Amino acid sequence: MTEEEKKRRPLVHHIRKQSASKSELPASQRRHAAGLSSRAQGERHGEKTPTNNQDSRQRRRVSFDSNTGRPAPKDHKPIHAGSASAPAGSSLNQPRKTTSQRQRTNSRTSKTTVEPLRRAHPHNPLPNQHPVTNQRNNRRNNNRTAGGQSSNNRNNNNHKTNASQNGTGRFGGALASGNNSARNNTRRRNQTTTAPGTHFVSGPARGIRRKSGPKGSKKAQRIAAAAVSKNRQNERKEQPLPKVLEYRLGMNVQDIAKIIHRDVTEILKKLFLLGVVVNQNQSLDADTIELLAADYNIEAKQKEEVDVSDIDRFFDKTDNDIDQSKLVSRAPIVTIMGHVDHGKTTLLDYLRHTHVTEGEAGGITQRIGAYQARLHDRLITFLDTPGHEAFTEMRARGANVTDITILVVAADDGIMPQTIEAIHHAQAAKTPIIVAINKIDIPGVDPNNVINELMKYDLVPEEYGGSTIEVPISAKTGQNVDKLLEMILLQADMMDLKSDPTAKSRGSVIEARLDKGRGAVATLLIQQGTLKTGDPIVVGNTFGRVRTMNDASHKKLDSALPATPVEITGLNEVPQAGDHFVVMDSEKDAREAGESRAKKAMEEERNNGAVVTLDTLFSTMAKRDMKTVSLIVKADVQGSVEALSASLKKIKVEGVRVDILHAAVGAINESDINLAEASGAIIIGFNVRPVGQAKTDAEQKHVDVRLYNVIYDAINEVEAAMKGQLEPVYKEKTLGTVSVRELFHFSKIGTIAGGLVTDGIITSDSKVRLVRDGVVVYDGQLGSLKHGKDDVKEVKKGFELGLTIANYNDEKVGDVIEAYTMEEVKANA
């Protein structure tokens, strides 16, 4: 037994005597005594009781290196006090210190211990000062002190002797005074202080200090941000001031700072010295902005307030508003017009050396096609417009954007209704007309007949002293087509067509559609400027940025010059065909203009709604009494939507009207099916098909979906459906009369009237009218008809019969029964 154990043994014996009665000792000392007793018993049997440090390490199943404080390998053996492997002079071979000695030592070394710990690298700590060891020891000392403080509060007067005796034992600090607690807490805070931006990690690797964030401490981030801000301020100061400060009302200090390249703080200081106290977000008036500009010795000029939504102002510019020095020659824009099937597309097909006509439904053009052809290294832009009467608006659009109109007239047909309409459109647009008399390859045709007819519409040929160029051609064989192109270039040279490629690009929408994968797709014809990919653009009531741009042959373009037809994507919605487009300064301006135009259009549509007045009351009530055919129109392009909707509205059937609930570009989707189901509408699809779940939904919800690729078929079938909506008109037809002469009453059958057919014929399915003294008593259906005892289908004049009237048993002798039927009168088509 060692000397330390001998010293400890009397204390154990003393505690055993004191614990004979449990009520004599406090709970804290009973726990202490139990711990000492178990320890002494273990040592008496040769068992070595581990210390507190060893207990914690065994519980965690991790051994630590005493020199570094890190987790040691599995084969590492800890060094215990008194072992041969303990280094000389280490704390493990030193005699155990009393509590007062430890406190004096800690108070002397606390200041010198903290500084090396702060400077120590987390992976290479100073000897005997590793964070793990210090943290663990301080935690144990603090717990001992806390236990001693609570014990002294209860037993301050009775156990001072025991506290001094236990000072050198295992629980030496357990009964120390409360003053030690404050010192231990202070020492614990000092020793566990770590460098900024680090923290201790719990677990076996506790004590390894790591960075708290990927970018270091917040202080370093603040310093870096301040440095960047200072660099930006210096860069602004290095930039020269503008000569003129162009401002608009409502600008704030931030807006002014961006224009004159100065810091916001600097401007606020100047305004404060000038007697103006504002913040950076407060709007400045014109006087304040001019005062600030004068302080910077620059001129202030207010911008004119321009309505960004008024894009039509760009098309109202005269020759005086255009810089003539920047104008260059451009390709002529030629529109091919004429009656249906007169050979417009065939002519263009020959020019392009493609076969467009064969691929078009019904062999007719149903949308505007924009293409380019080359002759003698010069480009000509062609627009092919439909000739059917339904496409009046599309022909008008083609005439409004064109330089020259090619009027195609078939030599065998002559002047037709759409030919006359095309002439009027071209004359209204004030464009020169070149007449192409087509189909001269047909035997027996005479082009002079066409020339004589055209003179009635002020189209006088040059040989008769007029200015109209006329060229007989054959689009099928190509005869005289080159001569026609030469006439086009000659006319273009006479017109001296020029444009400014450096101006803001503007033009018109030829066609628009909704593509499933690409979104809104618009075919544009550039009239001024150069359109580039990425330009912010306003198209009618829509806006966006040019995402992609292709030419007529689907080749991708980065830029397009005037008179070039292009197909673009990137718009937020499908625009209307015929709308103008303009490139804006920024996407913000484009968005503002597009949204403003859309809002105005919505307000105009709302204001143009039908208002019922005394003057229109009768017609409004008449419309409400009419049968309605509700339609939903979906087509592939905007021009087809307009043409089909206008044609359907023109169908006139007395008593029935067309109500188009919805007309849009794109495939038939689930929303269209739901709308049709709710409103009982018929869906008309033109060159489109149901997509996704729409087809299945239409079958399940019994929605009528009609699909067409020729406009004639759509119009004819809708007209037939409208005629079918009329209520049939019936006319009464008298069949015969019966004079009642005798009555037979049966309990199960009722009253049977016996009589004689005095006129006509009585059938078993006829309606009957009971007349008594010239007054109709009952009008209903014949119940049964008998001749003798047999049921018969009819009884002719002069024969007796027996009959019953359904739901009526009050016949009397002398009544007259009239038999009649209702026949439907066919409505006139």
Swiss-Prot record:
Alphabetical list of Pfam families matching this protein: EF-G_D2, GTP_EFTU, IF-2, IF2_N
Annotated Low complexity bias: 81-113
Stretch list, region G4: 438-441
One example GO MF annotation: GTP binding
Location of the protein in the cell: Cytoplasm
InterPro entries, sorted: EF-G-like_DII, IF2_II, IF2_N, P-loop_NTPase, Small_GTP-bd, T_Tr_GTP-bd_dom, TF_IF2_bacterial-like, TIF_IF2
Region annotation (Disordered) ranges: 1-239
Residues covered by region (G1): 338-345
UniProt keyword terms in alphabetical order: Cytoplasm, GTP-binding, Initiation factor, Nucleotide-binding, Protein biosynthesis
Biased composition (Polar residues): 159-168
Family matches, as PROSITE patterns: G_TR_2
Family named by the database record: Belongs to the TRAFAC class translation factor GTPase superfamily. Classic translation factor GTPase family. IF-2 subfamily.
The protein's role, per its UniProt record: One of the essential components for the initiation of protein synthesis. Protects formylmethionyl-tRNA from spontaneous hydrolysis and promotes its binding to the 30S ribosomal subunits. Also involved in the hydrolysis of GTP during the formation of the 70S ribosomal complex.
The protein's name: Translation initiation factor IF-2
Protein's organism: Oenococcus oeni (strain ATCC BAA-331 / PSU-1)
